[in-house]
A protein has these predicted regions:
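Flexible, glycine/threonine-enriched loop-and-boundary segments that flank and lead into catalytic domains
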Residues: 76-107, 186-191, 195, 203-211, ...
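Metal-dependent DNA phosphodiester-chemistry modules and their immediately adjacent helices/loops
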Residues: 1-22, 154-157, 211-304
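Acidic, low-complexity intrinsically disordered tails
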Residues: 303-315
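A short acidic (Asp/Glu
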Residues: 114-119, 201-210, 233-236
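Acidic, metal-ligating active-site segments
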Residues: 112-126, 284-288, 292-293
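Acidic, metal-coordinating catalytic cores used for nucleic-acid/nucleotide bond scission
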Residues: 194-203, 227-231
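Non-catalytic, compositionally simple segments
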Residues: 1-104, 113-115, 131-176
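Short, surface-exposed connector motifs at secondary-structure boundaries
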Residues: 184-192, 216-221
């Protein structure tokens, strides 16, 4: 029989230094007068807060089980809870609802024949913590009918529903993507666009930056690292906004699929996490696009929330 890890009464088995009164009334580490006994250091309030987050965030649950309760687990570090994700479907997001608003972009450019994602994050004018996500997803047309593509029926359905667009041929047409982003710059007040520092599309990024009026000192398109240090702030921010129910994705089914797929690498020293394509159970490009956009949002909020310097496109 395994104990219920959410039951406060059993926490003392793994945390003998627990101090406080459980929800059922059991007392640990306090004397008859209610004073803490010397040597009992783990406050039950802290455990309670971490347990609450663990219930809603799979990656936090794994961390809580292993580090707080000494429960060894083989589960992968799944990151986002789908029920919590669904609770962030707050209002419709369209070009019309975002027209003229300030945005922070993120591009996850495909290698050749995969998906390319262009995400824009729009902080609400009245509530900066409320962010609307506008996403555009492209796929090479040939991939819709490629029998080796196990997602082809999904893609075909999303194209019919207007959630996915295609470019002609077997490979993604970067000129189409760039032209669309330039067109968007006339509709929205784009502040910054983040792009994966490790990607191979230097020419794409350089041309886009030039066309958007970026400079070496003040780039419009900036390379962002995807490691623990660079992703610490964006990963924490996406979790915070989801828990506040303020990361409005408008019910986009592609983003929902990717949110369910994504897993993370957790720094064993406790210094953050980063998305892990290798262990994720499918495509996660849209989530990476959101993280790249959040990097720009955080930098606009001030240096305190930033963990890595922005880099002009200079590979």
């Amino acid at each position: 029989h395994e104990d219920d890890w959410t039951n406060e009464d059993v926490w003392v088995k793994a945390a003998p230094g627990l101090v406080g009164i459980t929800e059922s009334g059991k007392r640990f580490g306090i004397d008859k007068e209610g004073h803490p006994i010397p040597g009992y250091m783990t406050k039950i309030e802290d455990m309670r807060d971490k347990c609450r987050v663990a219930k809603q965030m799979p990656s936090a649950q794994n961390n809580f089980l292993t580090k707080r309760l000494n429960i060894w687990t083989q589960q992968e570090n799944r990151w986002l809870d789908l029920a919590l994700w669904d609770q962030n479907n707050i209002r419709p997001v369209t070009e019309e609802t975002c027209m003229g608003r300030m945005s922070y972009g993120g591009i996850d450019l495909s290698s050749v024949s995969d998906l390319t994602i262009w995400v824009q994050l729009f902080p609400d004018n009245d509530d900066p913590d409320l962010i609307d996500i506008l996403i555009r997803t492209w796929c090479p047309e040939a991939r819709l009918y490629d029998t080796k593509n196990k997602y082809r029926e999904q893609y075909q359905s999303w194209v019919k529903q207007g959630y996915m667009w295609t470019t002609e041929g077997d490979a993604i047409d970067e000129d189409v993507i760039r032209a669309h982003i330039i067109e968007d710059s006339g509709k929205f007040n784009i502040q910054r666009i983040g792009i994966d520092r490790g990607f191979q599309g230097y020419t794409f990024a350089r041309k886009l930056d030039e066309e958007l009026g970026g400079t070496e000192k003040d780039p419009m398109v900036a390379a962002v690292g995807m490691g623990w240090v660079s992703m610490m702030g964006p990963c924490q921010e996406i979790e915070r906004l989801l828990l506040l129910r303020k990361l409005n994705h408008g019910g986009n089914p592609i983003l929902r699929w990717m949110a369910d797929n994504v897993s993370v690498k957790i720094n064993p020293t406790g210094g953050g996490k980063s998305p892990n394509k290798a262990t994720s159970q499918g495509k996660i490009d849209g989530i990476i696009g959101i993280l790249l956009g959040l990097d720009g949002v955080l930098r606009n909020a001030g240096p305190v929330k930033v963990t890595d310097e922005y880099n002009a496109i200079a590979f």
